């Protein structure tokens, strides 16, 4: 079987080479090649493959057909999460709604703010869902709600380099009201309503780009914060303190020097603080980082200007950390919300509802969004929970897997996302 298939492949290779060489020869005769350009070196006759009689080709066709059936065979089992996984959250205070990003099934889900899934129920049905090919929503990870209009700003992180903006009433498979082409790996979003500016963090380029809030299409940013002195390292969440003119950016800790191949390195996770109008290669004013901070994969952040606090969704430790806006260096959080009773599992999204004095957390690890008093600390259970799957159902958190491997020693399947 191997020899026969090899002969077929070789016949294809020879045919391709002949066609390509013929084109190259014609091109050479018509014009000279520039120095360094492709040139025809020589044409050598190749030994022809063994000819097979027609009668001998029937078994080959049968073997190839059988191989095709093998390829079409159904898998023994499939590892797939069929429930929504919440990656970001925002509260539409004016309309009493909680909006959640579902990064697993590519949806934006809108719930009543007081929704509370009973322990016996599998899930809570949303009021509205934005989903489908026309929405340009894929691997949606960042979220902002316009406090006046209720417009929904949805950030895509991976396959679609697009920021989609929808009206508050949008539902189903609808076109966005407008879109903005964003750099690949965009994650966090924040808006300065006073200056009408839109801030986005870019993971792979280690930068923050600032656009007009109403920017669309291919419009370029008005400012870009990037450079070797900036200290960004895989930036994720971003929060603004317009009262003190500060910008807070959460970093995972994957760093590299721009335009220096091979300079990639791991640095401690951090919260970097910059002037609100920082531009170019501006170093941070302060950096919150170190073992006492408990930072581990800090995702989205929220700045509570009224109380002078920064809330951090601490994905790697399944906790919510709260720092003062004046903190610097290796400082302990003023509060930590963590423990089995909290039901917090791999939180990535966070929002502080100042009107109702509540904290809302999006948990990627267990298909839930949990609500607490704003000042909650320790192992405090949620006041309300919105679930998109059965109670206790762990989220697989598989997002655009690039490869797969089997660890024979640990009997584990490993896949990077």
List the model feature ranges, each with a label:
Residues 32-74, 118-122, 281, 330:
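Blade/loop signatures of beta-propeller domains
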Residues 41-43, 47-52, 78-106:
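Beta-strand-rich domains and repeat architectures in extracellular enzymes and scaffolds
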Residues 74-80, 126-134, 175-180, 221-228, ...:
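A short beta-strand motif characteristic of beta-propeller blades
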Residues 80-96, 133-149, 181-197, 228-244, ...:
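Beta-rich, blade/repeat-based domains predominating
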Residues 103, 113, 157-158, 203-204, ...:
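Short loop/turn segments immediately following the C-termini of beta-strands
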Residues 112-120, 166-172, 211-218, 273-281, ...:
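Short loop/turn segments immediately following beta-strands, especially the blade-tip
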Residues 251-268, 372:
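Short, conserved, GDST-rich strand-edge loop motifs in beta-rich repeat architectures
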């Amino acid at each position: 079987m191997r020899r026969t298939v090899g002969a077929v492949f070789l016949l294809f290779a020879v045919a391709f080479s002949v066609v390509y060489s013929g084109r190259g020869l014609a091109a050479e005769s018509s014009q000279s090649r520039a120095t360094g350009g492709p040139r025809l070196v020589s044409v050598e006759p190749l030994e022809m493959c063994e000819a097979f009689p027609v009668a001998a080709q029937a078994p080959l066709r049968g073997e190839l057909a059988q191989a095709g059936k093998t390829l079409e065979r159904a898998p023994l089992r499939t590892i797939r999460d069929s429930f929504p996984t919440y990656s970001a959250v925002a509260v539409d205070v004016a309309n009493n709604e909680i909006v959640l990003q579902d990064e697993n099934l590519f949806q934006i889900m809108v719930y009543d703010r007081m929704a509370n899934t009973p322990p016996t129920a599998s899930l809570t049905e949303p009021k509205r869902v934005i989903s489908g090919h026309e929405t340009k929503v894929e691997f949606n990870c960042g979220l902002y709600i316009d406090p006046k209009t209720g417009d929904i700003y949805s950030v895509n992180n991976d396959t679609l380099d697009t920021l989609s903006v929808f009206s508050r009433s949008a539902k189903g498979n609808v076109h966005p009201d407008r879109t903005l082409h964003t750099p690949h790996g965009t994650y966090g979003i924040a808006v300065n309503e006073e200056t009408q500016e839109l801030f986005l963090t870019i993971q792979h380029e280690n930068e923050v780009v600032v656009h007009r809030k109403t920017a669309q299409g291919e419009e370029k940013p008005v400012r870009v914060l990037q450079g070797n002195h900036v200290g960004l390292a895989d930036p994720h969440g971003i929060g603004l303190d317009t009262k003190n003119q500060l910008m807070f950016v959460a970093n995972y800790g994957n760093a590299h020097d721009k335009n220096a191949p091979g300079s990639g390195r791991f640095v401690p996770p951090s919260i970097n603080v910059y002037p609100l109008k920082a531009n170019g290669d501006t170093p941070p004013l302060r950096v919150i980082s170190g073992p006492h901070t408990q930072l581990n994969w800090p995702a989205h952040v929220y700045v509570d200007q009224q109380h002078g606090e920064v809330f951090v969704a601490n994905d790697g430790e399944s906790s919510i950390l709260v720092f003062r806006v004046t903190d610097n260096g290796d400082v302990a959080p003023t509060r930590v919300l963590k423990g089995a009773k909290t039901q917090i599992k791999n939180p990535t999204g966070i929002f502080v509802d100042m009107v109702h004095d509540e904290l809302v957390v999006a948990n990627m690890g267990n298909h839930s969004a949990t609500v607490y008093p704003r000042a909650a600390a320790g192992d405090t259970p949620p006041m309300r929970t919105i679930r998109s799957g059965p109670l206790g159902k762990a989220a697989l958190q598989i997002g655009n897997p690039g490869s797969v491997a089997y660890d024979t020693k640990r009997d584990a399947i490993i896949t990077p996302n």
